[in-house]
A protein has these predicted regions:
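Short, Lys/Arg-rich, polar N-terminal cytosolic tail immediately upstream
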Residues: 1-16
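Aromatic-anchored segments of alpha-helical transmembrane domains
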Residues: 28-33, 80-90, 148-152
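Membrane-interface helix caps and helix-loop-helix hairpins in membrane proteins
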Residues: 38-43, 65-68, 91-101
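Structural signature of hydrophobic alpha-helical transmembrane segments
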Residues: 40-53, 76
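Cytoplasmic-side transmembrane-helix entry/capping segments in multi-pass membrane proteins
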Residues: 50, 69-80, 103-106
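Membrane-interface helix-boundary motifs at transmembrane edges
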Residues: 61-73, 128-134
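Membrane-helix exit/interface motif
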Residues: 84-96, 120, 124-125
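Alpha-helical transmembrane segments that form the membrane-embedded catalytic/substrate-binding core
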Residues: 106-114, 142, 146-188, 214-234
Length: 234
């Protein structure tokens, strides 16, 4: 006798075959990388693999528990984005080797999250148990706000990971000029400008960079700005 859940699962796979194939292939790749990382005692890479597997599960979790039916194309884009960000970006060092990889991903993230937020609001407005409706303009605003909120929460996550696990998810930026109140010799609450910075010395050792090392602020603000652009484009 065929189990009813197996029959239902088979129908879902047949209905969403492109999504299932994409999910299965990417998940297999990540699991293999995870196993290799554990054998090599590379626990930071293993952390990124586990994070990727968790993020892969989010679209299915939202569909199952909240009734949010995502278009197949959008779901494939989400899976591809997660793989590109964590596996290609972090483990394969695309953030360092491919110019603007981080900027491109955060722009796409803004677009995808706005689309996801729009689907969520649309489903809520169609729910007969909820007595509210939104005009298209307010739905667009809600989708935009949802996208920006996800962008901010992701930056919180990156900051927390850097502080707790010693990662460097908030990438560094080399600057040649800074403005600082702390470095004002008079102690007044006015910024002093330091320009044409060419070297940075830490504990008497010169760092191999041609300027001052910003450890995440510029990267975070740039990420939020391009997330904003992606959300507005949607």
């Amino acid at each position: 006798m065929r189990h009813p859940k197996f029959g239902e699962l088979k129908k879902q796979i047949k209905k969403n075959k492109p999504v299932f194939i994409t999910y299965a292939v990417l998940r297999l790749i990540v699991v293999l990388i995870l196993i290799r990382s554990l054998f090599r005692a590379d626990y930071q890479s293993a952390f990124y693999c586990v994070l990727t597997l968790i993020l892969f599960f989010i679209p299915a979790f939202m569909e199952k528990n909240f009734g949010i039916v995502l278009p197949n194309t959008l779901e494939i884009f989400i899976l591809g984005f997660v793989f590109a960000a964590e596996i290609l970006g972090e483990l394969n060092c695309y953030y360092l080797t491919i110019p603007h990889w981080d900027t491109m991903l955060h722009t796409i993230n803004g677009f995808l999250c706005a689309a996801f937020g729009f689907c969520l609001v649309d489903i809520l407005t169609r729910n007969k148990n909820l007595k509210f409706s939104l005009s298209p303009i307010y739905m667009a605003i809600a989708a935009f706000c949802f996208s920006m909120t996800i962008g901010v929460l992701w930056e919180f996550f990156e900051f927390s990971a850097d502080c707790i696990f010693g990662t460097d998810m908030q990438k560094d930026t080399v600057l040649t000029a800074i403005n600082s109140v702390t470095l004002n010799p008079s102690g007044e609450n006015s910024a002093v400008s330091i320009k044409n910075i060419t070297t940075t010395v830490v504990n008497g050792e010169r760092l191999p960079i041609d300027g001052y090392l910003d450890i995440g602020l510029f990267d975070t603000m740039k990420d939020l700005m391009v997330n904003f652009v992606g959300a507005v484009v949607f």
